[in-house]
Curated annotation (Swiss-Prot):
Gene3D superfamilies according to UniProt: Argininosuccinate synthetase, chain A, domain 2 (3.90.1260.10), HUPs (3.40.50.620), Single helix bin (1.20.5.470)
Protein name: Argininosuccinate synthase
Taxonomic source organism: Nitratiruptor sp. (strain SB155-2)
Record's keyword terms, sorted: Amino-acid biosynthesis, Arginine biosynthesis, ATP-binding, Cytoplasm, Ligase, Nucleotide-binding
PROSITE patterns per UniProt: ARGININOSUCCIN_SYN_1, ARGININOSUCCIN_SYN_2
One Gene Ontology term of the molecular function aspect: argininosuccinate synthase activity
Known pathway: Amino-acid biosynthesis; L-arginine biosynthesis; L-arginine from L-ornithine and carbamoyl phosphate: step 2/3
EC number: 6.3.4.5
Protein location: Cytoplasm
Length: 405
């Protein structure tokens, strides 16, 4: 039996799936629908979503379209990059990190308009359903969550198109449809489905939309500098930029030089493996630069302990636990390590590669002048003998014991 719902806030893109969901919610739940469309740098016009929502009977005051690019990069992407977060050694979490912001705004809008439910368009097989719904319930444990893909029988594109036709839902014709399922934001674009479902099949070159191929990248390297303040990038080549503008600029550098493509098989939280191809040009550059900045500003043990946190931190984001107390606890520890991570990194970009060729910081712990001091003033080489013997003590003891046997 369908639960009684008075008003629902739908995460709405204006595409086929969410437009069908909009009409389905109206029919199935007989409720008022509020649409929320977030601009997080997906590169598509978001205003058409307003026109389509109006055509589908949504009141103007129930249509929310917001530019969240700066908030997305400042409050989600940059904190994640302070951790150098990578899932399973390769994935820079571009899709994962966008979901908590969208969910947060849905809950805030629901509170604002007096809605008792939220809805999303994620399928019942993927990670996004988990990410959205854990975020919803973390922020409002009393909210009703509607996941149409787990309820309806419109389980094919043909059925969706038939429903759209029967309900006069406008469908744009864009010629040949891409065989891939794609998702984009300011950090990355992802590709799934089509021939990628065969892990042996190489994707066609024309699949990649954001970056040049290695073959078409410039034959000459390009040098850039990135300035950091307390772990976050603040300027490129000495020019201060807002978080979103800075990531946009790095994306352009990465696009030009063929940086940031990966083709991986990942372990989904729901239990199955999936293949995905990703382009994260700016993020790939930023990760390399940030690690270089840390290399001269973090104490050895501080850096090593921070590195131990990273796999779990990345897993929490991938699985949808951004608002969990454990992620917030880890974030506080990570942010503490960034207090001295300020300075400049110089990079060479060339045919898919990011080379660190220089780094400097007013807080640098790299002090070559110590090696030029007179003997015994800072470091007496004879002290190494005791240091080595103490660290070898357990091996010496073990060797004696084994020999007696």
């Amino acid at each position: 039996m369908t639960k009684k719902v008075n008003k629902v806030v739908l995460a709405y893109s204006g595409g086929l799936d969410t437009s069908v969901i909009l009409k389905w919610l109206q029919e199935t739940y007989n409720c008022e629908v509020v649409t929320f469309t977030a601009d997080i740098g997906q590169g598509e016009e978001v205003e058409p979503a307003r026109e389509k929502a109006l055509k589908l009977g949504i009141k103007p005051e129930n249509i929310f379209i917001e530019d969240l690019k700066e908030e997305f990069v400042r409050d989600y992407v940059f904190p994640m990059f302070r951790a150098n977060a990578i899932y399973e050694g390769e994935y820079l979490l571009g899709t994962s990190i966008a979901r908590p912001l969208i969910a947060k705004r849905q809950i805030e809008i629901a509170r604002q308009v007096g809605a008792d439910a939220v809805a999303h368009g994620a399928t019942g097989k993927g990670n996004d359903q988990v990410r959205f719904e854990i975020a919803y319930l973390s922020l409002n444990p009393d909210i009703t969550v509607i996941a149409p893909w787990r309820e309806w029988d419109l389980n094919s594109r043909e059925k969706l198109l038939k429903f759209a036709e029967e309900h006069r839902i406008p469908i744009e014709k864009h010629g040949k449809k891409s065989p891939y399922s794609m998702d984009a934001n300011l950090l990355h674009i992802s590709y799934e489905g089509g021939i990628l479902e065969d892990p042996w099949a190489e994707p066609e070159e024309d699949m990649w939309r954001w970056t040049n191929s290695i073959e078409n990248a410039p034959n000459e390297p390009e040098y850039i500098t990135i300035d950091f303040e307390k772990g976050d990038p603040v300027a490129i080549n000495g020019e201060p930029l807002s978080p979103a503008k800075l990531l946009e600029a790095l994306n352009e550098y990465g696009k030009k030089h063929g940086i940031g493509r990966i083709d991986i098989v990942e372990n989904r939280f729901v239990g199955m493996k999936s293949r995905g191809c990703y382009e994260t040009p700016g993020g790939t550059i930023l990760l390399k630069a940030h690690r270089a900045m840390e290399s001269i500003t973090l104490d050895r043990e501080e850096a090593h302990e921070k590195d131990k946190l990273m796999p779990k931190y990345a897993e929490l984001i991938y699985n949808g636990f951004w608002f969990s107390p454990e992620r917030e606890m880890m974030q506080a520890a990570i942010d503490k390590t960034q207090e001295n991570v300020s300075g400049t990194v110089r990079l060479k970009l060339y045919k898919g590669n990011v080379f660190v060729v220089g780094r400097k910081s007013p807080n640098s712990l790299f002090a070559p002048e110590f090696s030029t001091f007179e003997e015994d003033e800072v470091y007496n080489q004879k002290d190494a003998q005791g240091f080595i013997k103490l660290n070898a003590l357990r091996f010496i003891i073990e060797g004696h014991v084994r020999r007696k046997k």
